[in-house]
């Protein structure tokens, strides 16, 4: 109890002392707090920096191990690809070697067999020799036949020439040109002429008509008719000696038929005739002349509307009024247009000019 009384008596002083002590300690408390905060901030900064350095070391180690793992994995893939490429190249080289050996064996055995080709060439050479001998014999036979035919042809030609020149044979009174007295012996042609017979020409057989009609007589006496070689009577005279042309050929050349020019042969109104012919063919093909004829009762109540050209007060222009031939006074010169083209001189002379030998120029 005494202690309680003592403490109660001292309670007022304790409160004052507590307040005084706290007021004295407040400045030191703030300084100590600032110092503690500074120390804690420095310590925590050191702790954080140390932890960051630790994390950097750990991250570096992790990255090193991870990158080494990726590098080893990539290297393994590269090694596998290189190994696969090397093996494929080796397999290809081996396949090429096998194919080369097999193809060489196949070509040597089946395609280019040396011994078979040697036998084949031997047989071919023997066959060629036999064919060459047969061809040589055939060529010699053909050459002999050709020489024989040429000799026969020359003999016939000489015989015909001798028969043709039989008039040059010498007589008892007059020697011929091949039997000159200045020669020691006569020419071989003299003996050929003596063996040959004179050439005789066969006269063409002309059938003479017993009676001639009036039309034939008019055709013969017309202005444009010419005598023909086939209807001429035979001329009873001696055959002329010499290399002359045949009489029928000369007469055909002399009395050849009329050859009109292009201007005379082609009609002037050919275009008009062609148009009329075309119009006639179209008219023959038509089933109905009035192709677009309307119904019979359709146009009864329809009002007629004249055209502006016909209903004008000036009137229509006449059809031939604008033609050049209707107004000769308006011509610049007195001559009209030439409607027909002139003929070509070169074409008109075709087949009409002959040389002295009778050939066409």
Swiss-Prot record:
Alphabetized SMART domains for the sequence: IQ
Organism: Homo sapiens
Pfam families the UniProt entry points to: IQ (PF00612)
UniProt GO molecular function: calmodulin binding
Family annotation (SUPFAM superfamilies): P-loop containing nucleoside triphosphate hydrolases
InterPro entries found in the cross-reference section: ASPM (IPR051185), IQ_motif_EF-hand-BS (IPR000048), P-loop_NTPase (IPR027417)
Residues covered by the IQ domain: 32-61, 55-84, 91-120
Gene Ontology cellular component annotations, sorted alphabetically: cytoplasm
Main location: cytoplasm
Protein name listed in UniProt: Spermatogenesis-associated protein 17
S-S bonds: none
Keyword line: Calmodulin-binding, Cytoplasm, Repeat
Region forming the signal peptide: none
Protein localization: Cytoplasm
């Amino acid at each position: 109890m005494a202690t309680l009384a003592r403490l109660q008596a001292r309670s007022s002083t304790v409160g004052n002392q507590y307040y005084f002590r706290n007021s004295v300690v407040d400045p030191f408390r703030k300084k100590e707090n600032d110092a503690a905060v500074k120390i804690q901030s420095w310590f925590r900064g050191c702790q954080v920096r140390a932890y960051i350095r630790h994390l950097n070391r750990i991250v570096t180690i992790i990255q090193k191990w991870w990158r080494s793992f990726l590098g080893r994995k990539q290297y393994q893939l590269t090694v596998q690809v290189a190994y696969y490429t090397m093996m494929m190249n080796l397999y290809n080289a081996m396949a090429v070697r096998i194919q080369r050996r097999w193809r060489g064996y196949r070509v040597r055995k089946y395609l280019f067999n040396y011994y078979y080709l040697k036998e084949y060439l031997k047989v071919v050479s023997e066959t060629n020799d036999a064919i060459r001998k047969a061809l040589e014999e055939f060529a010699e036979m053909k050459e002999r036949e050709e020489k024989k035919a040429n000799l026969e042809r020359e003999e016939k030609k000489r015989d015909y020439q001798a028969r043709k020149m039989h008039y040059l044979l010498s007589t008892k009174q007059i020697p011929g040109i091949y039997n000159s007295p200045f020669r020691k012996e006569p020419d071989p042609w003299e003996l050929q002429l003596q063996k040959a017979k004179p050439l005789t020409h066969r006269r063409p057989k002309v059938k003479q008509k017993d009676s001639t009609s009036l039309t034939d007589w008019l055709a013969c006496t017309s202005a444009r008719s010419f005598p023909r070689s086939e209807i001429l009577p035979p001329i009873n005279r001696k055959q002329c000696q010499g290399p002359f042309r045949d009489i029928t050929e000369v007469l055909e050349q002399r009395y050849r038929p009329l050859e009109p020019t292009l201007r005379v042969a082609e009609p002037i109104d050919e275009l008009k005739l062609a148009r009329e012919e075309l119009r006639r063919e179209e008219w023959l093909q038509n089933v109905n002349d009035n192709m677009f004829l309307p119904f019979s009762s359709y146009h009864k109540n329809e009002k007629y509307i004249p055209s502006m050209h016909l209903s004008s007060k000036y009137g229509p222009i006449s059809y031939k009024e604008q033609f050049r031939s209707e107004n000769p006074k308006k011509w610049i010169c007195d001559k009209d247009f030439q409607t027909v083209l002139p003929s070509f001189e070169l074409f008109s002379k075709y087949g009409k000019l002959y040389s002295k030998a009778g050939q066409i120029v």
